[in-house]
Amino acid sequence: MNKTYLPPQDIEGKKWYVIDAEGQRLGRLATAIAMIIRGKNKPTYTPHMDTGDFVIVVNAEKVTVTGKKSSQKLYRRHSGRPGGMKTEVFSKLQARLPQRIIEEAVFGMLPKNSLGRKLHNKLKVYPGSNHPHEAQKPEKLTIQTIPGGER
């Protein structure tokens, strides 16, 4: 019988990565971010523990989708009251709250339990190119989300 590896829980060992979302495909970018936040890119990955790193996403307003998704993809939210369902297409939400698009895509790929709720704090999304996390000395991480492309 195999035993699950139990890594030491040290917050100092967590890395910070900064990812530029300009021109990147939404789904492929969100998949890569979720893997880093969850810690699946490390040999010390443990399913029931937080072994992932922090991710800062800049230029969230410049993320792209393919096909007609910008006019057909719907984002829904509910106020909790009867008739309180609000729907918004991708292009309008991108103009209003561009960081919410990446947050929803990544959070949908994380576990729906207490560990998943803790992992939400590891994602920092900013619409512009500036972020307030220079003190953490984040590493620049490039992710290729365009198949056969230069990014």
From Swiss-Prot:
Keywords: Ribonucleoprotein, Ribosomal protein. Pfam families: Ribosomal_L13 (PF00572). Residues 126-151 are annotated as: Disordered. GO terms for molecular function: mRNA binding; structural constituent of ribosome. CDD domains: Ribosomal_L13. Belongs to the universal ribosomal protein uL13 family. Part of the 50S ribosomal subunit. This is Large ribosomal subunit protein uL13. It comes from Trichodesmium erythraeum (strain IMS101).
